[in-house]
Amino acid sequence: MRRQPKYRPERLAALIQETLADALVTELKDPRVGFVTITAVSVTADASHATVRVSVMGSEEEKARSLEGLNSARGFLRTYLAQHLSLRTTPELHFRLDRSLEHARRIDELLAQIKREESGS
């Protein structure tokens, strides 16, 4: 008989997001990790992998540095999750830049430009 998972992937993703956000604020001391916000977490059905989407304020260089810092802290953050969440297995973490906020800002700029051009004609 197969044991049912304790958490659904969506609930587990929310718990991981909350716990990692706490770890970034209180535990992670890497100077490369600047203004990082966890925007989303998705977990595979078997909970073996979690993709963590992050938004980083700053230049492309600062974003790359922050992502590098997060990737080097993956083991520490995974251990932190294991200590704070009662899971059978702790998912492998994969950090990705979330550029949706940048895209939304660019769309807003383009819409504002179109509006200015239409009102100016």
Residue ranges: model-predicted function:
Residues M1-H49, S55-S121:
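Charge-rich, low-complexity N-terminal segments
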